C-alpha cells in the first residue's frame, strides 16, 4: 500500500516509565552484526542512563494507540517518488544477509552485502538490471571503486582471506580481516586479485586519490581492540593507510599507520563512546581535507600529505552524541555534518522520548584558515517523524545533492526511511522531502531500512538492508540544477567537488 502524505509528521504519544517491565521483560535491543556496536542493551537489567533511556524510548513507541505505517506500506512527500525496486538476489535474500554501502561508476551501481557484493546496470534508472554478484562473506563489505578496481572492507574475523573463508575468532593469530581488491574490467566476471590485512580489520575505508595518478590510497577505519586479539591490540588510536599502485594492484600494501589520537581520544563514561579508532572518514581531496567520525570524537584532518594526515581540530559532544558515525562536507568545504549512530543502528530512537537532538546530525561550521581552522557547532537535525518500537531508526549514510548555491543532503535513516534536507543555513536546517517504507515486522525488531542513500547523476539510489535496491526521483525546484551534474564515478566518502556560485 502506498500513502502519499502532504500532512505533517506522524506523531506518537508517550507512555509511562512502568511500561518497560511489561513490554520488554528480558528482551535485548537488536543491533547490527558489525563489530564494535556500542550499545547492546538488556532492557530488564539496564542501569546505564543511556541504556535506560533507549529502553524507555522503545516502551514509548510500543505503547501508542497510533498504528503508524503498516508493514511495507509507503509514505512520502509529493516531491519524492520511488521509480524502481529490485529485491536482494539469492543467496543474499536472507534476513541475516544485510545490504550495506553503495558506489557508482558510469552506468553501474555496486552494492555491498555482508556476504559479498552485487553489480547493477543502472543505465535506465527505472529498470535497473542485475549484472553479476560475488559471494565473498565478511561484513560489512563496504565498497569503493576506482577505474578497473573494486575495494571491499572486511571487519569480520575470518579463517583466511579467501571468499570461501569461515568465521573464526580474532583471538586466533592466523585469523584475517582487512581489504580485498577485485578487478572489475569485466563487470559480468569480477576477479579477486589481492588482499591486504589491516589492524583490527576494515570496518569502513575511504578511497583517497594520490596527487600522482599512479596510485590511490585507502584510509582504513577500524576499532574495538582487545588484549585477546593479537592483531587488534589497545589502544588502537590509529588508522591504516593502504597504497595501491593502479597498474599493479597486487603490490598493494599498508604504508603507514598514523595515530589520530596520540594523547588518547574520548575516555568514555561521559555519555559518549570510548574512542578506540575511527568508524568512518570522509575525504575532500580537492580541499586537502578530511573529516573523521571516531566513536567519541569528531576530527578535522589536513590530508595534503596523503600518507601523513594531521588533526587540525577535535570536537566532542558528551550531551547528545553517543557514537560519531560518519561525516559529510558541504561543497565549499565550510561545513561538516556529523552523524550520531545512537543505539548502534539497532534501536528505535526516532521518538519523543529520545527527542530531536540525539541519534541526529550535528552541523558544524569550519572557521579560520590553515592550521587555525576550527569546528564550531551550529545545530542538530533529525527527521520529524516518529517510528515504532520494531523500527530501528537513527541517522546513517547520505550524500550531498550537487545543487548550485545551496547545501542539500539526502540521507538514510534505517527504518526511518529517506530524508532530503537543506542545511544552507547551518543554524536552521529543514527537511524538504522524505520517503519511508513501513516496518519490516510489526511484532519484532528486524534490522532493516536504508543503510546508504546517495544521489548519483539525477536520481537517488538506496541500499535497503532487507529489501534490496530502491531508485527514487526527486522533483523539487531547489534541487533541479542537480540534474545537470554528472560524475563519471562516485564514492561518497571520497567527496567530489562541483562548480558552485
What does each model-identified segment do?
Residues 2-35:
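Secretory targeting and sorting signals
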Residues 19-20, 35-501:
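Feature marking well-ordered beta-strand scaffolds used for ligand recognition
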Amino acid at each position: 500500500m502506498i500513502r502519499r502524505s502532504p500532512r505533517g509528521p506522524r506523531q506518537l504519544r508517550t507512555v509511562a516509565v512502568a511500561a518497560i517491565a511489561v513490554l520488554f521483560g528480558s528482551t535485548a535491543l537488536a543491533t547490527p552484526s558489525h563489530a564494535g556496536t556500542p550499545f547492546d542493551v538488556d532492557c530488564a537489567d539496564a542501569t546505564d542512563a543511556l541504556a535506560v533511556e533507549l529502553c524507555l524510548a522503545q516502551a514509548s513507541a510500543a505503547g501508542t494507540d497510533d498504528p503508524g505505517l503498516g508493514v511495507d506500506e509507503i509514505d512520502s512527500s509529493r516531491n519524492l517518488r520511488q521509480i524502481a525496486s529490485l529485491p536482494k538476489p539469492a543467496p543474499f535474500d536472507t534476513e541475516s544477509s544485510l545490504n550495506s554501502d553503495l558506489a557508482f561508476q558510469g552506468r553501474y551501481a555496486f552494492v555491498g552485502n555482508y556476504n559479498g557484493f552485487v553489480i547493477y546496470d543502472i543505465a535506465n534508472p527505472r529498470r535497473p538490471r542485475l549484472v553479476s554478484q560475488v559471494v565473498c562473506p565478511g561484513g560489512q563489505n563496504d565498497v569503493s571503486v576506482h577505474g578497473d578496481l573494486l575495494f571491499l572492507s572486511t571487519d569480520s574475523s575470518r579463517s583466511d582471506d579467501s571468499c570461501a573463508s569461515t568465521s573464526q575468532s580474532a583471538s586466533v593469530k592466523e585469523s584475517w580481516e582487512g581489504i580485498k581488491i577485485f578487478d572489475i574490467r569485466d563487470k559480468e566476471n569480477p576477479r579477486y586479485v589481492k588482499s591486504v590485512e589491516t589492524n583490527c580489520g576494515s570496518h569502513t575505508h575511504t578511497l583517497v586519490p594520490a596527487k600522482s595518478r599512479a596510485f590511490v590510497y585507502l584510509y582504513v577505519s577500524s576499532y574495538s581492540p582487545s588484549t585477546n586479539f593479537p592483531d587488534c591490540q589497545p589502544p588502537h588510536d590509529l588508522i591504516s593507510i593502504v597504497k595501491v599502485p593502479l597498474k599493479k594492484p597486487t603490490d598493494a600494501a599498508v604504508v603507514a599507520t598514523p595515530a589520530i589520537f596520540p594523547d588518547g581520544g574520548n575516555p568514555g563514561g561521559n555519555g559518549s563512546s570510548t574512542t578506540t579508532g575511527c568508524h568512518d572518514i570522509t575525504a575532500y581531496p580537492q580541499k586537502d581535507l578530511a573529516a573523521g567520525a571516531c566513536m567519541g570524537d569528531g576530527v578535522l584532518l589536513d590530508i595534503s600529505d596523503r600518507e601523513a594526515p594531521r588533526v587540525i581540530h577535535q570536537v566532542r559532544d558528551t550531551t547528545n552524541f553517543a557514537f560519531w558515525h560518519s561525516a559529510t562536507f558541504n561543497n565549499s568545504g565550510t561545513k561538516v555534518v556529523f552523524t550520531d549512530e545512537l543505539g548502534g543502528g539497532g534501536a528505535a530512537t526516532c521518538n519523543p522520548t529520545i527527542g530531536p537532538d540525539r541519534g541526529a546530525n550535528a552541523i558544524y561550521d569550519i572557521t579560520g584558515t590553515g592550521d587555525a581552522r576550527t569546528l564550531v557547532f551550529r545545530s542538530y537535525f533529525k527527521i520529524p517523524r516518529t517510528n515504532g518500537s520494531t523500527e530501528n531508526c537513527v541517522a546513517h549514510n547520505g550524500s550531498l545533492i550537487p545543487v548550485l548555491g545551496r547545501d542539500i543532503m539526502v540521507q538514510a535513516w534505517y527504518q526511518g526511511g529517506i530524508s532530503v534536507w537543506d542545511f544552507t543555513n547551518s543554524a536552521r536546517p529543514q527537511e524538504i522531502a522524505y520517503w519511508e517504507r513501513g516496518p519490516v515486522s510489526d511484532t519484532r525488531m528486524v534490522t532493516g531500512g536504508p543503510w546508504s542513500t546517495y544521489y548519483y547523476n539525477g536520481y537517488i539510489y538506496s541500499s535497503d538492508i532487507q529489501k534490496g535496491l530502491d531508485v527514487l526521483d526527486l522533483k523539487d525546484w531547489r534541487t533541479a540544477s542537480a540534474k545537470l551534474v554528472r560524475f563519471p564515478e562516485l564514492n561518497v566518502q571520497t567527496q567530489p567537488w562541483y562548480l558552485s556560485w
